[in-house]
């Protein structure tokens, strides 16, 4: 429910076109205006504010900002952002809010709240005329399931924004290379969806009768684990789950490990990979139901070796969606089915 999800056929139709892909003028202009506004302000901290899958998507921004710069950055779920009223929130803050529909009440209110504090506010949404976008000073809207190239969709737009922002906060030539190589994103998404299609189907076939599936990850990928757990397994498939941080696994959660307890482990490619490997080694000893998505095995064709760590998180959402599709296919439970969401007041 968070990453850009093109169907396999739609993606494969674009593979091998071999021409330089550029973002649409409208989208490029939106990002340029935001970056210009950032340059004019004395930004001292950054808040990423949203709910659910949108919050998970924004969390990659916080990961890269905190990893690459000394600018404090935070992730908040929208309602807590309002109720906690962070002391650091002021006219020197950048607040990025996101809602796919643009009408998530808590996030709309969070945008208004941040703007009232004098913060520079940026809204990200599918719909430019949504309530959320109307509350923020600046907007970024992305294309979705309309056969657009991925550079104009949510992942491409957000990563372009984040690396343009990094270039302002802590200039580095590698960010320019990331921005240039994002033109490969569409093709890489297609290739990795195809690469993991069999594994995803086998996952669905093997675990279709499981009532609980734990996910585990660290670094940037804990946000993918959270999204897969909350949005795909719990919300869409009604499978009990919990996203366990690999670094926290041995501080309590590992006691639930048993031969019949399923784990989906995301083996990351960043500095925290040793945490994932340690946890994986343990669950493999005691559980017969361990599946691994090894980020180092993704197809990174066209990406510089030293930039792969930045692209892994951009590709993993589409890969994990393949695993969810496998479960949906073999359980006969469509990902679109809801019991409560959008059907009643809550």
Give short role names for the model-derived ranges:
Residues 37-39, 84-90, 253-258:
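Short amphipathic alpha-helix with an adjacent loop that forms part of the alpha/beta core around
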Residues 128-140, 253-256, 300-309:
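Glycine-rich, charge-decorated loop segments at or immediately adjacent to ligand/cofactor-binding or catalytic sites
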Residues 183, 291-295, 313, 323, ...:
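Aromatic-enriched
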Residues 44-175, 181, 266-293:
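Glycine-rich phosphate-binding loops that contact phosphosugars or nucleotide phosphates
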Residues 296-335:
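Structured C-terminal subdomain patch of bacterial secreted/periplasmic proteins
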Residues 2, 6-45, 146, 163-245, ...:
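Active-site phosphate/pyrophosphate-binding segments
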Residues 223-290:
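Internal helical hairpin/lid segments
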């Amino acid at each position: 429910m968070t990453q850009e999800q093109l169907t396999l056929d739609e993606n494969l139709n674009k593979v091998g076109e071999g021409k330089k892909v550029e973002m649409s003028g409208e989208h490029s202009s939106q990002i340029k205006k935001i970056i210009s506004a950032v340059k004019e302000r004395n930004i001292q901290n950054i808040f990423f504010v949203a709910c659910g899958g949108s919050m998970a998507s924004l969390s990659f921004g916080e990961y890269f900002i905190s990893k690459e710069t000394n600018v404090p950055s935070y992730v908040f779920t929208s309602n807590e952002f309002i109720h906690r009223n962070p002391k650091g929130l002021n006219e020197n803050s950048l607040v990025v809010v996101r809602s796919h529909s643009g009408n998530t009440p808590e996030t709309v209110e969070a945008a208004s709240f941040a703007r009232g504090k004098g913060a520079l506010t940026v809204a990200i949404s599918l719909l430019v005329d949504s309530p959320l976008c109307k509350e923020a000073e600046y907007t970024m809207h992305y294309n979705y399931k309309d056969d657009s190239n991925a550079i104009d969709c949510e992942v491409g737009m957000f990563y372009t924004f984040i690396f343009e922002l990094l270039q302002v906060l802590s200039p580095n030539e590698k960010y320019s290379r990331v921005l240039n190589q994002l033109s490969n994103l569409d093709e890489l998404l297609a290739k990795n969806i195809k690469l993991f299609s069999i594994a995803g189907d086998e996952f669905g076939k093997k675990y279709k009768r499981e009532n609980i599936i734990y996910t585990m990850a660290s670094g940037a990928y804990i946000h993918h684990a959270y999204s897969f757990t909350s949005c795909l397994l719990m919300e869409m498939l009604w499978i009990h789950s919990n996203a366990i941080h690999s670094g926290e696994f041995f501080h309590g959660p590992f006691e639930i490990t048993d031969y019949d307890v399923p784990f989906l482990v995301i083996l990351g490619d960043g500095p925290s990979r040793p945490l994932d490997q340690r946890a994986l080694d343990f669950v493999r000893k005691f559980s017969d139901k361990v599946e691994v998505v090894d980020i180092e095995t993704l197809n990174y064709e066209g990406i510089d070796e030293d930039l792969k760590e930045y692209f892994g998180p951009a590709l993993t959402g589409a890969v994990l969606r393949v695993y969810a599709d496998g479960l949906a296919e073999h359980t006969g439970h469509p990902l679109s089915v809801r019991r409560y969401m959008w059907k009643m007041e809550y």
